[in-house]
From Swiss-Prot:
Phenotype seen when the gene is deleted: Leads to a wettable phenotype and to a significantly reduced conidial production. Also exhibits less biomass formation but does not affect the stress susceptibility.
Protein name: Class II hydrophobin 3
Predominant location category: secreted
Statement: the UniProt record of this protein carries the keyword Lipoprotein: no
Species this protein is from: Hypocrea jecorina (strain QM6a) (Trichoderma reesei)
The encoding gene: hfb3
GO cellular component: a single term: extracellular region
Free-text function comment from the UniProt entry: Aerial growth, conidiation, and dispersal of filamentous fungi in the environment rely upon a capability of their secreting small amphipathic proteins called hydrophobins (HPBs) with low sequence identity. Class I can self-assemble into an outermost layer of rodlet bundles on aerial cell surfaces, conferring cellular hydrophobicity that supports fungal growth, development and dispersal; whereas Class II form highly ordered films at water-air interfaces through intermolecular interactions but contribute nothing to the rodlet structure.
Keywords (A to Z) from UniProt: Cell wall, Cytoplasm, Disulfide bond, Secreted, Signal
Family: Belongs to the cerato-ulmin hydrophobin family.
Signal found in the keyword field: yes
Length: 102
């Protein structure tokens, strides 16, 4: 029984690891949210509470291609671009600002 729990843990960890292309470059879901397990969901949020929790968050209506377009897509619906952990019932408990374009 313990073996199955450990095997399941290792399997899910392997699935969560970022993939890389043939040149060894790690692929990211987007270029404007930080890498890792947190803050990977781009959302447009209405109200920011103390810079951490965001209320009334929605998925961007159009897929942004850069940090600048992410900001303009969210601004078009009157919201702020945020990179959040998985939201629960419209409330994103852990959020951060997107990575600025260099």
């Amino acid at each position: 029984m313990q073996f199955l729990a450990v095997a399941a843990l290792l399997f899910t960890t392997a699935l969560a690891a970022p993939s890389s292309d043939v040149n060894g470059i790690i692929r990211r879901a987007n270029a404007f949210c930080p890498e890792g397990l947190l803050y990977t969901n781009p959302l447009c949020c209405d109200l920011d509470v103390l810079g951490v929790a965001d209320v009334d968050c929605v998925v961007p209506p159009a897929k942004p291609s850069s940090c600048k377009s992410f900001g303009s897509v969210c601004a078009s619906i009157g919201r702020k671009p945020r990179c959040c952990a998985v939201p629960v019932a419209g409330v994103a408990l852990l959020c951060t600002d997107p990575i600025p374009a260099i």
